[in-house]
Amino acid sequence: MRIPTGAVLLACAAATAQGQTGVRDARLAPGVPHVLATQRAANISDVRYTLTLDLTHADSAPGAVTVRFRQPRVQDVILDFRGSGVSRIRANGVELPVTASSWNRAHIRVPASAVRAGENEVQVMFTAPIAAAGASIIRSRDASDGQDYLYTLLVPSDANLLFPCFDQPDLKARVTLRIEAPRAWSVLANGAATRVDTTERTLRHQFTETQPISTYLIAFAAGPYAKVSQRRALARGAAPTPVTMWARASRMKEAEADSLIAMNTDALQWLGDWFGVTYPFGKYDFLLAPAFPFGGMEHPGAVFYNEQSFIYRERPTTSQLLGRQATVFHEVAHQWFGDYVTMRWFDDLWLKEGFATYMAAKMQAAIAPESTPWKTFYLRNKPVAYGTDATAGTTPVWQALDNLEQAKSNYGPIVYNKAPGVLRQLDYLVGDSVFQRGIRAFLREHPYGNATWRDLLRAVGTASGRDLTQFGQQWILRPGMPIVSQQLRSANGRITRLALTQRPAQPTLSGNAPWLMRTSVLLYYTDATPVRIPVEITKTVTEVTAARGLRTPDFVFANDGDYGYAIVLPDSASTSWLLEHVGEVKDATLRAMLWGALWDQVREATLPPASFADAAMRALPLERDEQIAGALTSRLLTATQRYGRGGLRQTLQPRVERLLLSGAADTSRSYGQRKSQLDALIGSTSNAFMPTRMLDTLDRWLDGDSAAGLPLRAPTRWAIVTRLVAERHPSANARLQAEVVRDSSSEGKRQAFVAAAAAPDSATKARYFARWFNDSTLNEEWVTSSLRAFHDDDQDVITRRYLVPSLDTLPWVQRNRRIFFLGAWLSAAIGGQVAPEALAQVDAWLAANPQLGADLRRKVLQARDELERTVRIRTAYPTGGPRSTVHSDRF
């Protein structure tokens, strides 16, 4: 496998940083060292960038930047830049030689002799790369018309891959962009377009200077984009202003411009009211970006969304629509939390991401309460957060960071999913109106500036009259999470003792001290009004004294309302009742959490997978909540196909297939419920342990335009083809080739790439693994999409040979891929394994690589956890465990 030359360049940069004297200057190390950022933040102010770029070349963008700033005393100045080349450097009118000492391919050093006390101006001419992946300017080619579309993506520290700058969040700057592009192209950027000059073959676009923004938020897009503009008020009572949606010309007709523009502007208005600060960045445009590597990016004035998640090729489900709405609300919330007030350093990444997720949920609760938004919040956040926070690779919410080069490792469930859960606990602790007053004060204190988590807690603490220091120590700085076990004793139909015992999921990391938490304990009665008891958990064992003497409930649940943050393990009596009756609980949010509590017991290896599977198969035909049904189906398949060994799977596979087929064909259900069952059926049908005729059924569906009575559109057709390829169905190759001809769109080409990755043969796997690293034309989204197909659980023996190579490439992956890729890479490579031999390989690799960075080691440990649980569950329940047979003949 060939590793690209970036690793060599970084090594050269490190060597140059040491210099000819042999004395290492830590500031010049690759990346953006914290020591450099701290020094610059203390000395540099009033930064302005005037950035000019020429986008008329295929693979590179020549550019020039003028950097203006103030520095109170004469000392050297270091800019960050790791683009393709530097051709000229001028400082305050003085030409500087371009040498290895002035540009070490990571930083540009302006010597003190060229710097003034006070105002300074540095000009650099440079070249930035344009590529499908691994560049600051991403190129995506539309297969339908051959047109190229460009956009930038600079988070967390790729601004210095685009142009020389002070690439740290607490040196905000006013930015003016000037972009030359082909005449047929449009260009959008953070600022509003002010003028366009015409040349013979190009247009030169100039944009207004922005408000102060961090470098990672600078953005532009260029190409033959189509656009739709509407005049909308961005704040209640304000005059209407143009809001523009941009998309590829070939997809614009499919985009729901009216709906999406309204969704964005409604969010801007609601959040402006809630925060007490009107939208702070003037104009608002958003782009549906092709092949975008994640859900969205909050650039002020130019928000980018993932085109694939916003333009549907088949009828969307309610879950998809709610997910799209949540993404919009999340990115719009960032305009205040992240853009208007920004964390000082990426150790406080949670401050923007956690808040954006939490505010999106609060907004959904206010705008669309009928959608049960707190159920959505729980399902989208808590299981994912718990699944990471209970591992040996967990981190605190605040994550120490010595160099922005490692910032990508900080992205993941702790900041995106745990942090909003912690904020929900804080909101519950101080009260909603007090919480709002604190947040408004926080924003007023730091307009267009930077702040830390301590500033936030100080503002909320002042509003509430509480000292939140201990809260910060417990929930922001302490790694890990509590597991709360319920103990219930009764006599003569009355409770004699109800206690909550907590322990750390990872005592080595967290210590054994209890977490302090406010929660609500639910006593549930089928024939009476439930009893809710507020409880302050302050000790290892908390006695719920208010429950003594009350009638014994059907079940107890110690996190009613989802205000607490803990894995709750029900007592045995509650578990027994829930396994039989959880589907009868009417409150959808509570029902979702109860299923989660049962599933946590499976993952703790205290509840047999077969018992959960039996309960799920009895409940699914009656479940009418689309999101719960989807989550339950996913867990059912994990219980039977991953945690259940061959015997259990062989026994249950036909029942599961019939159950899913019946659900997909059930016209009494909503479209989304039926579609989720169909998708699950397609994705899980397998010949791994027994022949199944269901694959032939899937194959026949491709000859028509419906499946189980549902319309058969391109995404579902591709899912069927991928399954046929993965299972070596006789028609697989012919079906794949036919679908390639049928769907020649950009999305069709991506799906074909994914489908072929599923082939269970060594030659295909070798070809894909090499191409992931060696094909510079391969878009990162394509790689990410193909990982799960490549690492199919049923192909673990074939893919095990790539387990260690996948681990060996981690430093390269961290340097060259986007923020979420690292987690997806490890989740697929390690998560696609199920055997003890694979676990042994991971552990041996960790032992053999003590020099591995702590951040990468934690990422490996996070992914390892699911493999370790799989092995432990399979060992504890070699046949899946006991299960009820009372209802076994239902399907």
Where are these regions (language model features)?
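Extended, low-hydrophobicity, Ser/Thr/Pro/Gly-biased non-transmembrane segments
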Residues: R27-A29, P33-V35, M125-A235, A513, ...
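Surface-exposed beta-strand/loop patches in extracellular or lumenal glycoproteins
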Residues: A64-G83, T176-P182, R454, T501-L522
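Bacterial N-terminal signal peptides
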Residues: G6-A15
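A surface-exposed beta-strand-loop module
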Residues: V77, F81-A143, V541-T552
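Long, ordered, helix-rich scaffold segments
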Residues: I495, G511-A513, T526, I533, ...
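Hydrophobic alpha-helical and helix-loop surface patches within well-folded domains
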Residues: F207, A238, T244-S510, T638-A639, ...
